[in-house]
Curated annotation (Swiss-Prot):
The gene is pyrH. GO terms for cellular component: cytoplasm. It holds the Pfam family AA_kinase. It comes from Pseudothermotoga lettingae (strain ATCC BAA-301 / DSM 14385 / NBRC 107922 / TMO). Keywords: ATP-binding, Cytoplasm, Kinase, Nucleotide-binding, Pyrimidine biosynthesis, Transferase. This is Uridylate kinase. Pathway: Pyrimidine metabolism; CTP biosynthesis via de novo pathway; UDP from UMP (UMPK route): step 1/1. InterPro entries: AceGlu_kinase-like_sf, Asp/Glu/Uridylate_kinase, Uridylate_kinase, Uridylate_kinase_bac. The keyword Translocase does not apply.
Length: 233
């Protein structure tokens, strides 16, 4: 069992694949999955993307740095919506960010993170790394290390890592376990290189799993075989 985990979610979990905005049935499912691991007794941090609000290619006509800042604010919107949804079912939750000072958001003070966890709060990190040119994958790796997580879970719509694209190659082989070195040398695109670098440096394992498989988060937290795991070299 892992005691403290960071869950990286795509914005699509708020609306469903290929959709936009917010879909209540998807959000109810998301809350249910988070509640399972909270009830199990682990400390939970969350980083969520903003793909349900907009996608990067839609902002190609403006400078990249501005597009990234818009993306950061999109993650704040999702974080606040998720906070409200978790609180509605009795889960204590706090949103922390370095990019905004809204009344419902607290600044990131790392001395406070352990206090939040000790008090039973889920901590949602909004606003990415607070700097442009970095992905939410990198933000998840950074926040996972900063909060002292012993597992990073990337919750996706696929059930793990494959040696080639299973949509294009019916013979693609699932890799249940792989090292950071192999993941990087194979050029696997499950996370960006900056995220791999941070996790590898601090020997933080990553589980890639299908979020839409009921109970997959809980199985990962329990240390059961689910998805694919990237282990330190």
């Amino acid at each position: 069992m892992y005691q403290r985990v960071l869950v990286k979610l795509s914005g699509e979990v708020m609306c469903g694949e290929g959709s936009r905005g917010f879909d209540q049935s998807n959000i109810n499912y998301l809350v249910q999955q988070i509640a399972q691991i909270v009830d199990y007794g682990v400390n939970v941090g969350i980083v969520i993307g903003a793909g349900n609000i907009f996608r990067g290619e839609e902002l190609s006509e403006i400078p990249h740095s501005l597009a990234d800042q818009i993306g950061m604010l999109g993650t704040v919107i999702n974080a606040l919506y998720l906070k409200g949804s978790l609180q509605k079912v009795g889960i204590k939750c706090v949103v922390v960010s370095q990019v905004t000072s809204l009344p419902s958001i607290r600044p990131i003070h790392y001395d406070d993170i352990n206090l939040y966890f000790d008090a039973g709060y889920v901590v949602i990190f909004a606003g990415g790394t607070s700097n442009p040119f970095f992905t939410t994958d990198t933000a998840a790796a950074l926040r996972a290390v900063e909060m002292g997580a012993n597992l990073l879970i990337k919750a996706t719509k696929v059930d793990g890592i494959y040696d080639s694209d299973p949509k294009k190659n019916k013979s693609a082989r699932k890799l249940d376990k792989i090292s950071y070195y192999d993941a990087i040398s194979r050029g696997l695109k499950v996370m960006d290189m900056e995220a791999f670098s941070i996790c590898g440096r601090y020997k933080l394992p990553i589980v890639i799993l299908n979020f839409f498989e009921d109970g997959s988060l809980l199985r990962a937290v329990r240390g059961e075989d689910v998805g694919s795991i990237i282990m330190p070299d």
